[in-house]
Regions:
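N-terminal binding-site loop/beta-alpha segment at the start of enzyme catalytic domains
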Residues: 1-81, 132, 265, 281-282
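Alpha-helical scaffolding within the catalytic cores
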Residues: 6-15, 65, 71-72, 97-101, ...
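CE4/NodB-like, metal-dependent polysaccharide N-deacetylase domain
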Residues: 22, 96-116, 135-139, 160-161
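Acidic-and-aromatic substrate-binding clefts and catalytic sites of carbohydrate-active enzymes
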Residues: 35-38, 58-66, 88-95, 121-124, ...
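Short, acidic/polar
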Residues: 36-47, 92-106, 155, 178
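A structural motif
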Residues: 52, 108-111, 142, 166
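A short, structured active-site edge motif that brings together acidic residues
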Residues: 78-91, 112-119, 149, 173
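Beta/alpha (TIM)-barrel catalytic core signal, keyed to glycine-rich beta->alpha loops juxtaposed to Asp/Glu
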Residues: 119-283
Length: 283
């Protein structure tokens, strides 16, 4: 696969809209969903050693304290790490206090990216939450604000009622769930697409014969093949593991490129089915 990846060689994408001008997000991030707080020190610490410079946590994950401990280490340059956290559904009407609590756990004065975790449409207060997020950005407390799991009608409503779209939308995305209509809306409006559950492990994507065959062709693992697919679609992609070897493996996706027929084969895997909750009903 060629030269080993370093953090300096990881590509970045520009965040627009509700962002500090010129803010860049590394295209590969390290997610800590389902990582116990006590395990974050080792996993995130190892990720930093390997070269990750983008960490994704959330209040509901229960491990912001662990992320904060690592960020506070003397050998970690806070300005060198892009930090994301999220507001949970029960705090849509309490965003400033929720933000303060997260910042206290993270030990930060300024956050890079704050996200609404789910639209929770039955509550019907996500526009209020978005307005509060924009206020935090205007106050200089967060460099960029965005959302997770918003569908086109949710995004359109934010635009109609506030005039400002998110800089990024973090969504469930994989070759088995390609969300073409939503990604087209993102592209049209300058919203960065960020993928969670990018490997669709629960759906068996890594054992799919097409993925296995293409991985063998490029002499990479099925996971590396799929993560590379995300990068070539200009997505930000979140990896997740507590296993040192797997953390390293997931980072080594920049030493090869997919061919047009590879992309065509992967495009044909779309099933349109989710492994996670439905954003139109969850929350």
């Amino acid at each position: 696969m060629g030269v080993m990846t370093t953090h300096e060689s990881v590509p970045t994408l520009s965040l627009g809209h509700a962002s500090t001008p010129g803010l860049e997000i590394p295209q590969i991030g390290f997610g800590v969903w389902e990582v116990p707080d006590t395990d974050v020190d080792a996993a995130f610490g190892r990720a930093l050693e390997i070269g990750y410079r983008h960490i994704d946590t959330a209040r509901i994950y229960g491990n912001e304290d662990g992320v904060g401990r690592v960020l506070g280490r003397e050998d970690v340059d806070r300005d060198d790490v892009f930090v994301t956290t999220k507001v949970w559904n029960d705090d849509h009407t309490n965003v400033p206090a929720a933000f303060d609590a997260s910042m206290g756990r993270l030990g930060l004065e300024v956050l890079d990216l704050y996200l609404i975790h789910w639209p929770a449409p039955e509550q019907d207060v996500y526009v209020d939450a978005w307005t509060a997020m924009l206020d935090l950005q205007r106050q200089g407390r967060v460099r960029s604000v965005g959302v997770c799991n918003f569908q086109v009608p949710h995004l359109q409503r934010l635009l109609d009622e506030t005039g400002v779209l998110p800089s990024i939308n973090q969504i469930e995305l994989s070759p088995y769930l390609q969300q073409r209509e939503l990604r087209a809306f993102h592209a049209e409006h300058g919203i960065v697409t960020e993928a969670w559950s990018p490997l669709a492990v629960r759906a068996g994507l890594l054992d799919d014969p097409v993925v296995v065959e293409l991985a063998a062709k490029h002499e990479v693992t099925p996971a590396q093949l799929v993560l590379r697919w995300h990068v070539e679609l200009d997505n930000v992609v979140l990896t997740r593991s507590v296993t040192p070897a797997r953390i390293a493996e997931n980072f080594e996706i920049f030493g090869f490129a997919l061919e047009d027929d590879d992309l065509e084969a992967l495009a044909g895997l779309d099933r349109g089915t989710r492994t996670g909750p439905d954003p139109d009903t969850f929350g």
